Amino acid sequence: MSKIKVLIVDDSAFMRKVLEDILKSDDEIEVVATAKDGKEAFELVKKLEPNVITMDVEMPIMNGIDATKQIMAYKPTPILMLSAVTKQGSEATLKALDNGAVDFIEKPSGSVSLDIRKIGEKIIKQVKDASKSKVRIKSSRILENIKKEKQDESSTPKPQVEKTSGLSPEKLNDTAILIGSSTGGPPVVSSIISNIPKNTPPIFIVQHMPKGFTRVFAERMNNNSAITVKEAEHGEIVKPDHAYVAPGDSQMVLQKRGGNVYIIIDENMPKIHGTKPTVDVTAEYVTKYYGKNTIGVLLTGIGRDGANGLKMVKNKGGYTIAQNQDTCVIYGMPKTAIEMNVVDKVMDPIDIPLEIIKFAKKIGG
């Protein structure tokens, strides 16, 4: 079996060496070269054709975002961004994901020399996962749609979307939409949410993402959406026309008191399927309170999280949608759900917003 050829791109000689040592410790990985900036990386990609690239965000000469754009235009290659847990770092990382990077490695804070080695196993796993991902960017309708949306963005932070769902207001509080996503998901979730009209039931978004990144993810979506998108807060009342993003490193659950549903953010609940937030955990509570009026959507990602969640939706009589294989960066979570026979509709994400509203109207009458 041939080794996974990795190119490391970082302006820090120390970080290049640490990453190289970590990756070389695994027999299935070969570090073919290192580069100190995006320009050098692009030349090495043309020469060496690596299977995976680890890419720093902030670098001289050519930064990680511009390098990602160039590489994806020349030869789509799985790119893992190495990102700082700061607002600026999170924004840059999400921008790189919009431009084709498949995932990101959270750059440790504090004593880098100690912390980076602590997450060595995770880095190796992410590189292996990335090597299995599909990055045929040119053929992806959803990413072309995202690019168009970015071009259409004006200086106005929130677009004035005139269309509404047409749902009867009295039913909006009885219906809920759950969206679960992992690797390759942020641009897809963003595109779906940007095409959701006003007068829509509450949406619960579980994207596998660490603390700090989820808030920026929500803020970016909010700037391009007809509804309010926010990182979920402990104790807040669930409302229609709102999308709630589960905070990183916490589980998002629900509680009903009187006639209201409240969001509970629990940092102490364990990881399930090796991740927190977990789609399956939130699904248990969404289906508990919304039952047959739940619409479950499962998008690209590795592993099986969300498959049991869709099963819960089906068991309650709700409606389930999975992203099709052709558009998935990693066809893991949707594939598991489809194999479990708990998916009503398999489709391109570009068609999902319309499908959500169509089914919500059936519920809302």
Curated annotation (Swiss-Prot):
Residues 146-167 are annotated as: Disordered. Transmembrane segments: none annotated. This is Protein-glutamate methylesterase/protein-glutamine glutaminase. It is found in: Cytoplasm. It catalyses: [protein]-L-glutamate 5-O-methyl ester + H2O = L-glutamyl-[protein] + methanol + H(+); L-glutaminyl-[protein] + H2O = L-glutamyl-[protein] + NH4(+). The gene is cheB. CDD domains: CheB_Rec, REC_CheB-like. Belongs to the CheB family.
